[in-house]
Amino acid sequence: GELKEKKDLNVGWVHRNGRRYFFNHREEQVGTDQVKKVIDVSEHNGRISDWKKVIDDNGVDGVIVRLGYSGTEDKELAYNIKELNRLGIPYGVYLYTYAENETDAENDANQTIELLKKYKMNLSYPIYYDVENWEYVNKSKRAPSDTGTWVKIINKYMATMKQAGYQNVKVYSYRQLLQTRLNHPDILQHVNWVAAYTDALDWNNPHYSGEKGWQYTSSDYLKGIRGRVDVSVWY
């Protein structure tokens, strides 16, 4: 009896009556039956030789592709976009920032725009500015620690993107950072994709309403992709 009860827990992706639902580890439903399963990929996932199979075998609805990081293009970007375009798979993109100031943020935006044009991107999901607590390997540089600097950086990136005609631009970060140094209305209004590898998201953004994503794991295994994959529920 006990094993059966365990097996029937409503956790993760659950199929019922031809519909699909998502439950967190407290068995609380996230969103409705319209939730989407979204993965994000970069060169760290290696060469994904059969994108169609990845989508079909894993029930993936969308992909967020890494453009690269400040000043550098992701080695698999050209290939990933070519394949997603060819197969008509819905995607968005993200740029990991090493910005320390507004000049860096403007450079990040120009890099983003350049890559969007270079690969003729046809986006179904947003363009994400990936803001994390970065530091150089040798610790010679690290992310600004004060909220005010991040407000300036993010405002500058957003303004530069908007000026170039890009409207659907958002911020991705993780819960702990959003509760601390990124906890400012000017930043939170742009945040709709959040990482928290915990039983539940346990975070609410009063400054944004609309479709959003919870990246609930960085260590799922999907058929057709080597190594561990980030997976999000879109709701």
PLM region spans:
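Extracellular adhesion/carbohydrate-binding repeat motifs centered on closely spaced tryptophans
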Residues: 1-34
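Functionally critical loop-and-helix segments that line ligand-binding/catalytic clefts
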Residues: 31-43, 49, 57, 187-235
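Substrate-binding cleft of extracellular glycoside hydrolase catalytic domains
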Residues: 34-158, 162-164
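Conserved beta-strand positions
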Residues: 41, 65, 129-131, 171-174, ...
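Hydrophobic anchor at the start of a short beta-strand
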Residues: 91, 167-169, 192
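Glycine-rich, charge-decorated loop segments at or immediately adjacent to ligand/cofactor-binding or catalytic sites
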Residues: 104-107, 177-185
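Structural recognition of alpha->loop->beta junctions
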Residues: 113-128, 133, 182-209
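Aromatic-lined carbohydrate-recognition surfaces of secreted/lumenal glycan-active proteins
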Residues: 166-179
